Amino acid sequence: MELRKLKRGKSEKTDNKVAYIFLAPWVLGLLGITLIPLGASLVLSFTNYRLTRRTFSFIGFDNYVEMFHDPRLWQSIKVTLEYVVIATPFQLAVALLIAVLLNQGMKGLAFYRSVFYLPSLMGSSVAIALLWAQIFGAQGLIPTIFAKLGLIKSFDYSYIGDSRTALITIMILHIWTFGSPMIIFLAGLRQIPTMYYEAAAVDGAGKWTQFWRITMPLLSPIIFFNLVLQVIGAFQSFTQAYIISNGRGGPVDSTLFYSLYLYTIGLTNRFEMGYASAMAWLLVVIIVIFTGIAFATSKYWVFYED
């Protein structure tokens, strides 16, 4: 018995060592890539640290107070909120529409699903942002077509060079990358039992009624998941605005996203990492508030099947 217990003890110790070995990369990654930088940024947010200066000192809440008096920061918040509030619902609506169409049992589903998912893979790339700038810029594809149709006066008109339309072009790019939420919607639609639709059809319910009375309530948890995911992602948008505006957020700060302004403060113009760190934590607070609102209101429109 004692020999068996001894062998079992050695075996358990070996298993524990193996478990620790496999867990080590994840723990080290969590510490090195997430927790330590997170803690460092919090500490830096209370300092006047600059990349161009070796020494720094603690200044308390001065960085946070300065944010309230920074007009460009408030402009970046305004631009980002417009982007999140307008582009995200439109993107989810397009994703849901395409998912519903693909769920009708059409042939070649795998092909169409792959085609519609491609924009999500490419949409945040530098190449697509450059292409977008060419399409909507002066003498680009869109101005050329609209000029020939007589909708605008000149081929030289630039949608990305006009403060009234520059943000809209980036919103269109965001909406175009609907593939990721579409795949999630499609997976949710395929989980809805067909017997509900059959029973509704027997009762005389049309397709539109079935959609609002069956599909939407049963799909509401998926809609909620996609909404939270896309809102968090939209708040952190950077690449498209950086490329299309040449890193300036123009014209007239009309595409000055919060992440873009944070980048210019910390890594390009002023190199004020202390202030940039404070801005990063403000962004965390804003995202938490919006996510909290989504969770708090979900009980009124998200339904879970018993």
Language model features by range: what are they?
Residues 1-14:
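Short, Lys/Arg-rich, polar N-terminal cytosolic tail immediately upstream
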